[in-house]
């Protein structure tokens, strides 16, 4: 019978990769909670309409990349390609989107049908952060400062913050008309097939195209930051003042538009020079019309997402911590007592394993040595009768016979002594 294998573009995570993912998640909890964010968990499966209305019908995500299928009643469902829309749906449905400032973070798997490559999988994982209820530039700046602190807590270096403003519903249409006029005369020798389609329907996305010829022929395209209305210009200036005051370096990138249609005003991306072509590790911005677009109140919001696979590429993978003990049972009659002794040690805070079936002393000692355990605990018939155990120090050498009653205290003292040496 043929082996069943995982789907292309999906991955199994074993240590040390799974350990790195746990570190990314735990660090997120620690940092974001200091800013008042609470953890939220939302479904991975949503109605397709949610993403069509929030992300935009003309985006590559909706047009090409979503995993969409009918359920048994013919309703169109989609595995989430990003987290923000689902978080907004949850806040609206639960009535939390209109209760003042709502600050939440979430994490988990997303799904996009893309060509698998380093740092980009069909199932990928994101850390998602959303703050809903305030239009203020200071919140935008604080979100960026929090993101910077989070990435620093992960130990990441060689990162660049790219910053832009996309204007609002008052000034962006004027800029889009100017951009369409600039793109109107361009032909297929100058723009890729996607950009030829987008230049009228979604011209902003042409600026974000990564195809070299498109970048070359749009190098002199008008800049949206030159067409901001006074309110958007003041908002963007306030964001930059706070970042400057905090000493946070950034680069202005007038071509930064992101891949989702709901962004307005502040938009940003964090890029790394250490992971090749998939250089973006985090990105986000303001989305003041998103909640209203999915049937909620007209409230503003700002947030970001971090790609966990890409973060993991930048984090040093440490070896799994070695266990404190490995129990060796010399006689089958001692297996049950050995298991109970191991249980007592775990309850006292130690990590380690005990055998479940009779094995030779040689194979057990070999396994104990391979595990890297600090102590090998030997339980034979003599020790079983006397209520003792032989403690072999696998790092400092030597061995002692110790009463089982004081074993936890003995191991703790030896571990402390070993740390001090």
UniProtKB/Swiss-Prot annotation:
Keyword Nucleotide-binding listed: yes
Subcellular location: Cytoplasm
Pfam families the UniProt entry points to: HGTP_anticodon, tRNA-synt_His
One of the record's GO molecular function terms: ATP binding
BP term (GO), one: histidyl-tRNA aminoacylation
Top class in the EC scheme: ligase
Annotated EC: 6.1.1.21
Main location group: cytoplasm
InterPro entries membership: aa-tRNA-synth_II, aa-tRNA-synth_II/BPL/LPL, Anticodon-bd, Anticodon-bd_dom_sf, His-tRNA-ligase, HisRS-like_core, HisRS/HisZ, HisRS_anticodon
Catalytic activity: tRNA(His) + L-histidine + ATP = L-histidyl-tRNA(His) + AMP + diphosphate + H(+)
Subunit structure: Homodimer.
Record-linked NCBIfam families: hisS
Listed name of the protein: Histidine--tRNA ligase
Organism expressing this protein natively: Solidesulfovibrio magneticus (strain ATCC 700980 / DSM 13731 / RS-1)
Chain's gene name: hisS
